[in-house]
Amino acid sequence: MDKRLLVKRTLGCVCAATLMGAILATHHDSLISVKAEEKTVQTGKTDQQIGAKLVQEIREGKRGPLYAGYFRTWHDRASTGADGKQQHPENTMAEVPKEVDILFVFHDHTASDSPFWSELKDSYVHKLHQQGTALVQTIGVNELNGRTGLSKDYPDIPEGNKALAAAIVKTFVTDRGVDGLDIDIEHEFTNKRTPEEDARALNVFKEIAQLIGKNGSDKSKLLIMDTTLSVENNPIFKGIAEDLDYLLRQYYGSQGGEAEVDTINSDWNQYQNYIDASQFMIGFSFFEESAPKGNLWFDVNEYDPKNPERGKDIEGTRAKKYAEWQPSTGGLKAGIFSYAIDRDGVAHVGKEYSQRTYQELEAGLKKHPVVDNISHTDYTVSRKLKALMAEDKRYDVIDQKDIPDAALREQVIQQVGQYKGDLERYNKTLVLTVDKIHSLKGLEKLSHLQKLELCQLSNVKEVTPDILPESMKKDAELVMTGMTGLEKLNLRGLNRQTLDGIDVNGLTHLTSFDISHNSLDLSEKSADRKLLMTLMEQVSNHQKITVKNTAFENQKPKGYYPQTYDTKEGHYDVDNAEHDILTDFVFGTVTKRDTFIGDEEAFAMYKEGAIDGRQYVAKDYTYEAFRKDYQGYKVHLTASNLGESDTSKVTATTDETYLVDVFDGEKIVPHMTLHVGNGATIMENLAKGAKVIGTSGDISLAEKVVDGVVADSFWTWDTKNWIAFDLNSQVIAKEWRLFNGETDPRFKDKELNIQKGRLQILKDKTIHLENMSKDERDSYLADEQNWITVSEITSNQKIYNGSITDITSRYWRFCVDEGVSSKSPQYTELQILGQRLSSDIASTVQD
């Protein structure tokens, strides 16, 4: 989240010093500053058994939608601070109602020798267990990474992390007699955690998961993470997700959109890659006393002097929206949670208080006369929210009305979830392997299922569209193996593009099938033709083949662009006509089985295909509906002189050769060579990588114009300049090209263009420049009398193309004589186009 989530704070102390102390310590990470109690706690066997049973019920979803709350320990009447004094007598954990499934012990400002800890282990745990509420201790992630608490006493080595994990579980779970551990991971606004600290925290977290949680040795304890971080910003979550019982995501304040849940929706799209919806809980915050800006969430109703009880009403609150929200895919959420449940029923301050600061509150300013005071709560809001979720029919348990077959129902509940609302949201794979399954009725309710595997279901007699998920009509995958008892296979009208995944050889009792009205390619060489013939053979083993018991007609195969094209070289005669490369060489459509259909005539022939006189393509299927449109494709041409253009049109006026790249919008589809007439030899940019041996300007800038990249410009403060370069061997040059100043992508300024310039070669082709001293060479290269001009620029075109009549030379120079304006003339690239001479020819030329 972009905004600062200064979460889980309290400012409820009376005196100014105490107020500031609370302010500095109430972020979740303040948990790290509290020394864990050293006393050993022994809980009675009965409480251990009850707690284990509660955890099992919660984990198995038998409690329905969960409601959880964070109780701030310093607001319990038994809590005392470092001074030994009672802090707030108004509330007690003992009064938390049965509607709260999980109560989090969120401790701060509570001394290690406070009576609270004995009350927790000797009274609260027992009382809350009796009513069905589990208790979980919350600690900050810095207890795991070496920053604070126990973690400072253990080395960051495998043995040390293992010992630290054991100490954490003993101190915070076993000795306190609670039912699990919750680790809080939030964004640090100052003194941010390092990657190394997060890596250590993850290692310790994994060691804790070996001890408690669903995958731990003690499965009677819950292992939970609560966080303000999204998936991409939480490497610890990604590393431990498979071991978590629940992920509690803090969504305090508006989350965007009309329903204020946009962030939740987008986050869930990522979370569902790591956890099930039944592990996902979203949270709101009650109003904390004396909270400053940055910690005012407006998740509950604002105070109304005309209605003092408005804080107990859930209508119109964000808390209610969270209770009603469900993921669109994956399943039903586990439930919701609240922070500062001890403030349940207290209305929120109004918007007029939204900018109040710590300093103002410390000075006794901008405090609300009613809601900033501590008051006794009866947990009305929590009760209402739990009741609202419990009344949600989507949480009704799947029964025989949904899925009549008991064996099928059991497998669906195991993999999908036990609630009716899970059926329509489940979007993963369902694997059915129990031979006791006789009927598949009810699977149609799995409207988002991505893959269905039917394996060894020998007692299933038929598979028909009315009992298959709606997603089968889209892109869901169907796998059938070992279906030896299947007699009727009906996949009619499911938009199936292939029969892949269906073990047709195993359908030994098949008496009829209907695969008509799909998108299958049943042409002679396709794989589906072979599968169809096997299906017909299976039916023929039991009865005579008829139209009624073997339906495969009315196919409408979907068209695709070919992955490869056969044409690697193309040819046009010199006919002075304009030709379209896309139309002539890049065309055609293929089926899912890669059957190529080039044009409408070929499609008409394809439609005539038949099996035993029965046409398999739908008569009303048209070429226009099948063919792929190449309108969005782009063609890039490189001529023999390396001139480039983006067009599919070529006018065949002279012998030429083009290198053709066709783009489908993302990648090159085909690459081909196109010859016009007798073709032409593809030239080389001989200047690319040439050695700059002299210049009137900066040599590092000069090297940019022969690096093969149209980017940085060469320029000098003078309006005239020159560059001399060595092509490293004798060449024969036919053309040259200059990329003028406006091609610099940084400026695109025509006033930087060159108006006049000259391309030159050395008069003396036998000269050995390498034998000269640097000063001698610089003087020689700068002397105009040593050069012959072979071509000139007389216009300020963006890209100037010049002709040279088969010039042979190794050393070249380009001179800028005039720009188009008072600005220093520039150019980004110079190309000399032609071929390098073989060594024997080069020697002859030099001689």
Curated annotation (Swiss-Prot):
Organism expressing this protein natively: Streptococcus dysgalactiae
Gene Ontology MF annotations: mannosyl-glycoprotein endo-beta-N-acetylglucosaminidase activity; metal ion binding
UniProt-annotated stretches for the region carbohydrate-binding module (CBM): 683-836
GO CC term, one of those recorded: extracellular region
Signal sequence annotation: 1-36
Keywords recorded for this protein, A-Z: Calcium, Glycosidase, Hydrolase, Leucine-rich repeat, Metal-binding, Repeat, Secreted, Signal, Virulence
Residue numbers annotated as active site: 186 (proton donor)
Subcellular locations according to the entry: Secreted; Host extracellular space
One Gene Ontology term from the biological process aspect of the record: symbiont-mediated evasion of host immune response
Catalysed reactions, semicolon-separated: an N(4)-(oligosaccharide-(1->3)-[oligosaccharide-(1->6)]-beta-D-Man-(1->4)-beta-D-GlcNAc-(1->4)-alpha-D-GlcNAc)-L-asparaginyl-[protein] + H2O = an oligosaccharide-(1->3)-[oligosaccharide-(1->6)]-beta-D-Man-(1->4)-D-GlcNAc + N(4)-(N-acetyl-beta-D-glucosaminyl)-L-asparaginyl-[protein]
Enzyme type, top EC level: hydrolase
EC number per UniProt: 3.2.1.96
Family affiliation: Belongs to the glycosyl hydrolase 18 family.
Protein name stated in the entry: Endo-beta-N-acetylglucosaminidase EndoSd
Binding-site list for Ca(2+): 704, 707, 829
InterPro entries per UniProt: EndoS-like_Ig-like, EndoS_F2-like_TIM-barrel, Glyco_hydro_18_chit_AS, Glycoside_hydrolase_SF, LRR_dom_sf
Repeat positions for LRR: 423-446, 447-470, 483-506, 507-530
Binding annotation for a glycoprotein: 107, 188, 250, 252, 288-289, 295, 339
Matching SUPFAM superfamilies: (Trans)glycosidases, L domain-like
Residue ranges occupied by any GH18 domain in the UniProt entry: 65-377
Function according to Swiss-Prot or TrEMBL: Endoglucosidase that acts as a host immune evasion factor by mediating hydrolysis of the N-linked glycan from the Fc region of host immunoglobulin-gamma (IgG) during infection. Specifically catalyzes the hydrolysis of the beta-1,4 linkage between the first two N-acetylglucosamine residues of the complex-type N-linked glycan located on 'Asn-297' of the Fc region of IgG antibodies (IGHG1, IGHG2, IGHG3 or IGHG4), thereby preventing interaction between IgGs and Fc receptors and ability to activate the complement pathway.
Keyword Methyltransferase in record: no
